Amino acid sequence: MGDNHGDDKNIEIWKIKKLIKSLEAARGNGTSMISLIMPPRDQVSRVTKMLGDEYGTASNIKSRVNRQSVLGAITSAQQRLKLYNRVPPNGLVLYTGTIVNDEGKEKKVTIDFEPFKPINNTLYLCDNKFHTEALNELLESDDKFGFIVMDGNGTLFGTLSGNTREVLHKFSVDLPKKHGRGGQSALRFARLRMEKRHNYVRKTAELATQYYINPATSQPNVSGLILAGSADFKTELSQSDMFDPRLAAKILNVVDVSYGGENGFNQAIELSSEILANVKFIQEKRLIGKYFEEISQDTGKYVFGVEDTLNALDSGAVETLIVWENLDINRYVLKNSTTGETVIKHLNKEQEANTENFKVDNNDLDVEDKMSLLEWLANECKRFGCALEFVTNKSQEGSQFCRGFGGVGGILRYQLDMTAFDEDLDVYDDDESE
């Protein structure tokens, strides 16, 4: 799994979270809201037949209003299913029905999509709300973690993903024991012992690169690494120059275990369970910690605030874009009703309520397009060539980033003089006012 795949997954997970939120908030009158989930390898014909049977049953509902809305929902589900010859490889999720919006008006909605990973649930429910419990399975982490269990008898390389553990490779080693005798030869024995130890650490480091670095992307194929073992081999490995720096950056924990081999692997998993459960939290702290470090060292390789960040994105300077996952800012494309010019504005709830933001020189600005800035960034980040990371405000660092930096910022590839953008804008404003 390269970084690119990781970014895509971040965006997919954010989209599902957003969808769950809006589906959970939706309410309807009567039981006119259908939740339908089909796992991979299910048959479209089976569900079509079931919906036909449901239609027959619903025709007997006594209340005319309720009957019509239920039949309407079943019909729109049938229509949408006609677009699929077969169930997509990851399954199919369909929500359809009549919801009541904030103004009390009824509105028909239909949402259908193939999840970004297989969904193993079958669901059909007709209710006054959409059922999203099954979608939570898509949010569960399927991150893969690497384990290196190293002691005086040999090394084991393994991975853990969810509850599935796999042994990739193990090898034994015969290291000479410390000698009490030897007289003149004691130094020679010590030197041989050190040499064999050194070779053992080197072999382990080389195999670690072989098993945990994806040759296609040159990036680690695991989300984190746990080094385990008895004695100090694991520490020696983590501090060794021979250990690949790309993997060293992924070390989450170094643990002491009483055994080597598979028993040690099981023990290491047990001892690391808390860290693995909080890995998203740890990654977030590290990411924002790196961002704060750029600021405290005043490297000039950072940017914060919506406008500065977007300017830096435009110039291709942003390496990692960091955004709060609940950022409540909309991107407006506005058209001057008199001159026909378009402007883009980014407004929060408070600014949206101020009509002055929709005027320029007493001319009204018409809304051509309105979109959540988060959604726009998720769709466009590929074009800017940057990695997009969503953060929460649950960690101390995350909370500080959201409160102090407006929830939008970036780590830059190179220094950028942000004042140059302001000067360009000033020149532009002067031209406007003349």
From Swiss-Prot:
Pfam families named in the record: eRF1_1 (PF03463), eRF1_2 (PF03464), eRF1_3 (PF03465)
Gene name in the database record: ERF1-1
GO molecular function: translation release factor activity
Coiled-coil segments on the chain, per record: none
Protein name: Eukaryotic peptide chain release factor subunit 1-1
Function comment: Directs the termination of nascent peptide synthesis (translation) in response to the termination codons UAA, UAG and UGA. Modulates plant growth and development.
Family listed: Belongs to the eukaryotic release factor 1 family.
Keywords, sorted A to Z: Cytoplasm, Growth regulation, Protein biosynthesis
GO cellular component term, pick one: cytoplasm
Annotated source species: Brassica oleracea var. botrytis
Compartments in which it is found: Cytoplasm
Top-level division of the source organism's lineage: Eukaryota
Chief localization: cytoplasm
SUBUNIT field: Heterodimer of two subunits, one of which binds GTP.
Membrane spanning stretches: none
